[in-house]
Each structure stands twice: as C-alpha cells, then as structure tokens.
C-alpha cells in the first residue's frame, strides 16, 4: 500500500489544535446531476445501507439513481437559498461562530467544517489541517445522538484517511451529546422563544431521523438516545407525557423503520381532533432538506389535509447563541488536557523550547 506524500517536517514549530465539525452532506447544486453524484456517494456507504453489495449495486445504479435524482433535485430547489444549500450554509456559520466563541474564552483552536458526503470532504479538510500544522484534532459530529449509520461513518472516513498517512495526528472523537445539559438547554430556549411569540400548541411533536428497525435489535443505541433527549427536553419544558410525542421521519425503502412514523402520526393527530401542533427536529442541528422540505412542506400539508388547523415548524438550532455555547462546552470537555489555553509566561516557555529544538536539529544537519 502506498502512503500519501507528507509535507516537510518543520523543526521548532508549536503543534496546533483543531476542531473538525462534520455534518452529513449535501449536493453542490439543486440539479439532477449534482444530486445523482451526492446520492451515489451517500447510498454507497455500507453503514447507510446494509444490503449485500452486489445486489445493492444493481438497485442503486439501475433503479434509485435514475428515478430518484430528478425528484430529489426539485425538492432541493424548493429550499435552496442565495447562499447555497441550507445545511452547508448553517454548518459553515456554526464553525465560524465556534471559532470566535472558543477564542473569546482564551483557546488557541482552529475550527473547520466538513461533510461526510459531498464537499468539503473529510479527507480534503484533514489534508488542509495537516498542511497548516495541526497535530491535535477533535472530530465533532453534528449528530447529538449516536448511530452506526451516521456517527460511525464519520469515524470510518477519518480512519480510512489516516490509514494512508505516515504522520498521524493525535485524534479525539465526540461520540454523542444527546443528554448534554447545554444541548438540552439550547433546545429548551428555542422552543420557549417560539412559544413566547406564537403561543403553545395542543401537542409538541419531536421528530427524529429514522433508521431501519433492525439496527436497534442489532445493538444500535440511536432509538434509546433519541427518547432520552426527548424526555430530558420535555422535563425542561414541564411537559406531561400526553403533551408531546416522539416520531421518526425520512423512511427510505420498504423495510420497517423505527416507529411511530412522523407523517402518519400527524395525520392521526389531526383526525383525532388535535388542531394545533408544533414540530421540532432535535436530532438535526442545522436546517436541511429533511426539515425545511419534508417537515415544513410535506408533513405540514398532510396535517392540514387531515383536518388540522395550525402547523408550526420550530427551526433547528442553526446559529442560535445557546447552541454555539453548547458546542463550545462540548468541545472544551473533550479537549481537556490539550494545551489550548496558555498564559503569556507558559507560551514564552514553549516558544523558547521550540527555538532550542530548532537549533539542535540544525546542528545535526536538518534544513528546516
């Protein structure tokens, strides 16, 4: 196996720390060709679709991509902004705000973002961080709840990249933060702010992205972590069990997924006499196709056509101040022990050590 070419090693330089915020991904444009490229990468991941590769290849290449790409492109076009894909726009802004927040707290930390599928890709950003001298990297998935279909796939991408690197940086990974106090508090503030403006609903629906039910029986903790998030948020909102419901959306294919499904549940609520619902998607930290189009357009239509009168979608955390603060606290927790905050005296001491190392290396014949 061949290895990637390493940048020249520089003596006397201080190692840097970086946080890599990773989201799912998005097409580069709301066009059939761009969506086809994106779906091909996404649905080719064995973490996402656990079907024998040969069988799945024919299904993907001959059925799904030819017929689904155009339909999905129209949906992306409905939510595309002048800045681009909402998911990419929000994730990029979160990374910039997190940089500022950590810097204001005294951390010397660089924050970059990447997409598991699409661009900027995980390998692309990891190469960039290496070229800039980052020797400590915290991988922070944008998924509060862990799943082998999402979080683990990010870890796979990182491991796969470094399997061909000679000089591997120190790595840390955030597995989940579904029950982190600051994350729950950010959700609470978002919901309360909406209620202050629009009033309370008859029912709060917490809709999480679905996964095949078999993943639960095979040991994936995602279902349990979603319910724990919902329970903790309901407690902070002083909701009783009959005032909220947990559902799962975005079912793909014919296999059974985690239930209850979001759209049928909303239809059932409307037919049972529930007039107003608020829908929140706690597992999505950035608004995207699944929230803006699936929930904001399709599920809204289903609820109203079934007899409901008032449907409100509560936006994702996006660039919410409380969420950026939560991200910072989660990152700080996982960077404990890394020298990201140095006093002037300690910084000067480290710089002096670096100068001594450089001088000694040059004495031994090093060029840089």
Swiss-Prot record:
Keywords: Cytoplasm, Heme biosynthesis, Iron, Lyase, Metal-binding, Porphyrin biosynthesis
Keyword NADP: no
BP terms from Gene Ontology: heme biosynthetic process
Pfam families named among the record's database cross-references: Ferrochelatase
InterPro entries per the UniProt record, alphabetical: Ferrochelatase (IPR001015), Ferrochelatase_AS (IPR019772), Ferrochelatase_C (IPR033644), Ferrochelatase_N (IPR033659)
Major subcellular location class: cytoplasm
Compartment annotation: Cytoplasm
Gene3D superfamilies in UniProt: 3.40.50.1400
Any one GO CC term of the record: cytoplasm
GO molecular function terms noted in the UniProt entry: ferrochelatase activity; metal ion binding
SUPFAM superfamilies referenced in this protein's UniProt entry, alphabetically: Chelatase
Reaction catalysed by this enzyme: heme b + 2 H(+) = protoporphyrin IX + Fe(2+)
Domain of life: Bacteria
PROSITE patterns: FERROCHELATASE
Residue positions binding Fe cation: 209, 290
Documented EC number(s): 4.98.1.1
Pathways per UniProt: Porphyrin-containing compound metabolism; protoheme biosynthesis; protoheme from protoporphyrin-IX: step 1/1
HAMAP family: Ferrochelatase
Family from the record: Belongs to the ferrochelatase family.
Function (record text): Catalyzes the ferrous insertion into protoporphyrin IX.
PANTHER family the record matches: FERROCHELATASE (PTHR11108), FERROCHELATASE, MITOCHONDRIAL (PTHR11108:SF1)
Protein name, entry field: Ferrochelatase
